[in-house]
Amino acid sequence: MAAENPSVSGVSGRYATALFELARDEKAVDAVKADLDRFKAMLADSPELTRLVRSPVFSAETQSKALAAVLDKAGFAGTTAKFLKVLTANRRLFTVTDVIRAYGALVAKFKGEATADVTVAEPLSEKNLDALKTALKSVTGKDVALNVNVDPAIIGGLVVKLGSRMVDSSLRTKLNSIKHAMKEAG
C-alpha cells in the first residue's frame, strides 16, 4: 500500500503502513488516528517533549522511560501506546511526525478522502477550516482531510498542497514576486 501513495514512503511510510494495517485489523483506525493527532498536539504544545522525541542525545533507556511516563500521564493505552514504544525501542521516535502524517494519508485513502497539506501564518478558526474543506471538496469531488501547519514565516495567506497540485497564496510569495519585478524593472 505504501508504494501506491507517494506521500507514504521511506522509514516513516513503512511504520505508518504497519500501524495502519494493525489498526485496520483491530478495527481501531479512527481511535489510533485520534490518539496520533492528540500526540501531535502534545508535541506542538511542549518544546520539552519535542526535544525528547527529536534529540539523539537521549539514550534509548531514558527516552523509553520518559515516553512511557508521558503516555501514562496522558492516558494513552492500547495500539497507539505500544506503537510509540516500538518506535522508541527501535530508535525511530524522531520520525513520529512523519509517521503521523503518513498514517493520516493512509486513513484518508482508506476512507476515500483526499488529504491536503495546508500551511497558514496563524491558526484557522473552525469556520475558516470548514470553508476551506468545502472549497477543496468542490474541486476534488471528495471529502478532504486537512493537515494544518502553522508557519509565521509565510506572513499571511495560505499554501495548499493537494496531491500533485500546490496553490501558494501566501503574502511572503506575493512580496517576493513584487521584489523580483521591481529588480527587473530597475
UniProtKB/Swiss-Prot annotation:
Which stretches are transmembrane? none
Q: Which GO terms describe its molecular function?
A: proton-transporting ATP synthase activity, rotational mechanism
Specify the protein's topology with respect to the membrane: Peripheral membrane protein
Location of the protein in the cell: Cell inner membrane
Where does the protein principally reside? membrane
Alphabetically ordered keywords of this record: ATP synthesis, Cell inner membrane, Cell membrane, CF(1), Hydrogen ion transport, Ion transport, Membrane, Transport
> Which InterPro entries does the annotation name?
ATP_synth_OSCP/delta_N_sf, ATPase_OSCP/d_CS, ATPase_OSCP/dsu
GO CC terms, sorted:
plasma membrane; proton-transporting ATP synthase complex
Stored PROSITE patterns: ATPASE_DELTA
**SUPFAM superfamilies, per this entry?**
N-terminal domain of the delta subunit of the F1F0-ATP synthase (SSF47928)
Superkingdom to which the source organism belongs: Bacteria
| Pfam families tied to this protein | OSCP
Which PANTHER family does its entry note?
A: ATP SYNTHASE DELTA CHAIN
Record note on quaternary structure = F-type ATPases have 2 components, F(1) - the catalytic core - and F(0) - the membrane proton channel. F(1) has five subunits: alpha(3), beta(3), gamma(1), delta(1), epsilon(1). CF(0) has four main subunits: a(1), b(1), b'(1) and c(10-14). The alpha and beta chains form an alternating ring which encloses part of the gamma chain. F(1) is attached to F(0) by a central stalk formed by the gamma and epsilon chains, while a peripheral stalk is formed by the delta, b and b' chains.
Function of the molecule: F(1)F(0) ATP synthase produces ATP from ADP in the presence of a proton or sodium gradient. F-type ATPases consist of two structural domains, F(1) containing the extramembraneous catalytic core and F(0) containing the membrane proton channel, linked together by a central stalk and a peripheral stalk. During catalysis, ATP synthesis in the catalytic domain of F(1) is coupled via a rotary mechanism of the central stalk subunits to proton translocation.
Family the entry assigns: Belongs to the ATPase delta chain family.
Q: What is this protein called?
A: ATP synthase subunit delta
Organism from which the protein derives:
Rhodopseudomonas palustris (strain BisB18)
- The organism's lineage? Bacteria, Pseudomonadati, Pseudomonadota, Alphaproteobacteria, Hyphomicrobiales
Gene name, please? atpH
